[in-house]
Amino acid sequence: MIQPTHSSRRILLPARGWFIYLSLCAALLLNLIPLGRLPGIPDWVALTLAFWCIHQPLKVGMGAAFFFGLAMDVANASVMGQHALAYVLLAFAAGGLSRRILWFPVVAQALHVLPLLLGTQLVMLMIRLVTGAEFPGLLYFLSSFVAILLWHPLNYLLLLPQYRAIEHDENRPI
């Protein structure tokens, strides 16, 4: 499958389904690391979900977002459906914007992903406030900004298994 980006015109191998869901499970495990209430820790599931919904919108969508959202709700003991709703909206927006976002270089992709991640956090914050929680402060949104700084390494890491080996063949022009 051809992935249009400015930085690379390489033809990528198809993404394997097991690798996609393994990376989402690894992101879920990263979210479960008990780091307390440190500001700036990114939501790894949201970041990885946004990546796969942009790069493989036919393989990862709202169903996977709902499943991993419920898993996060259970893991965090939060209001049931809080993460699920936010992740489904993230998957819908990322899948809808995937063709547009892929035309930009990786740095510009990160800037396009920032409103998606901020929107995800805003949905979760609104649900918390409706259920009676206190406003956590503006540092709550710092994790989205840290996440876009991690977009480039995550992009490289998750696309690495899809890169085709560069081998020159006289009979094959591509």
Predicted regions and their residues:
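Terminal, non-globular segments
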Residues: 1-174
